[in-house]
Curated annotation (Swiss-Prot):
Species this chain originates from: Moorella thermoacetica (strain ATCC 39073 / JCM 9320)
UniProt cross-references to PANTHER family, sorted A to Z: URIDYLATE KINASE (PTHR42833), URIDYLATE KINASE PUMPKIN, CHLOROPLASTIC (PTHR42833:SF4)
Residue numbers binding UMP: G54, D74, T135, G136, N137, P138, Y139, F140, S141, T142
Subunit structure: Homohexamer.
Designated gene of the protein: pyrH
Coiled-coil stretches: none
UniProt cross-references to Pfam families, sorted A to Z: AA_kinase
GO terms under cellular component: cytoplasm
Keyword Membrane (UniProt): no
Protein name stated in the entry: Uridylate kinase
Family statement: Belongs to the UMP kinase family.
Length: 240
């Protein structure tokens, strides 16, 4: 096995990825597989912090589109990410991986509050840290949370684990002729509406020179491939 290309990573796992083929809730096989892949990466000495989405349980944007107050809908989405984070923590600890959950909204009975220095210390001690409840503010996505935490923790890369295996020129689940894009620069993502991440998150990554790798989570071993720098999915960053 080769040497890891990245020393500290933010792994962004979409809520939809946790649902697997069932489309809603948490697929136990999927979350166990993800946990085993994270364990494999952690054993290489890579610092791993995780941001989990909540779309398998609730999506704030959809709630607000149906007439719900946007802030309320977003807070419900943040709570959905806490559910996912606790499930992932349990899956990791069942495999012997020391894990901490930190929430952007305090709920001390079930998790630590997010404290940057404490999170860094956990990583230095070899623990996996899961960041839940987004940024703690409505109107900000979990993609933006991933970009923000990557900047705060000086991560080398954001690994975006999704249901699809990269970024396409159109929706591959609708268009069978869609083509996967190998390399993109930030401005192309910002201007092209390619659905990598929202503009706030992309701008934050661009301003702080944080590359993004978008890949599919279904195939076991993909997280390790991304860590080792193998060509996988779509790379977003500054192109030479």
């Amino acid at each position: 096995m080769g040497q890891p290309k990245y020393k500290r990573v933010i792994l962004k796992i979409s809520g939809e990825a946790l649902a697997g083929n069932q489309g809603f809730g948490i697929d136990q096989e999927v979350i166990t597989s993800i946990a085993s892949q994270i364990k494999e990466v952690r054993e290489l000495g890579v610092d791993v912090a995780i941001v989990v989405g909540g779309g398998n349980i609730w999506r704030g944007v959809k709630g607000s589109a149906r007439g719900m107050d946007r802030a309320t809908a977003d807070y419900m989405g943040m709570l959905a990410t806490v559910i996912n984070s606790l499930a992932l923590q349990d899956a990791l600890e069942n495999q012997g991986v020391d894990t901490r959950v930190q929430t952007a909204i305090e709920m001390r009975q079930i998790a630590e509050p997010y404290i940057r220095r404490r999170a860094i210390r956990h990583l230095e001690k070899g623990r996996v840290v899961i960041f839940a409840a987004g940024t703690g503010n409505p109107y900000f996505s979990t993609d933006t949370t991933a970009a923000l935490r990557a900047a705060e923790l000086e991560a080398d890369v954001i690994l975006m684990a999704k249901r699809v295996d990269g970024v396409y020129d159109s929706d591959p689940e609708i268009n069978p002729e869609a083509k996967r894009l190998k390399d993109l620069d930030y401005l192309t993502v910002l201007n092209g509406g390619l659905g990598v991440m929202d503009s706030t998150a992309t701008s934050l990554c661009m301003d702080n020179h944080i590359p993004i790798i978008v890949f599919g989570i279904k195939e076991k071993g993909n997280i390790l491939k991304a860590i080792l720098g193998e060509p996988i999915g779509t790379y977003v960053g500054r192109l030479e």
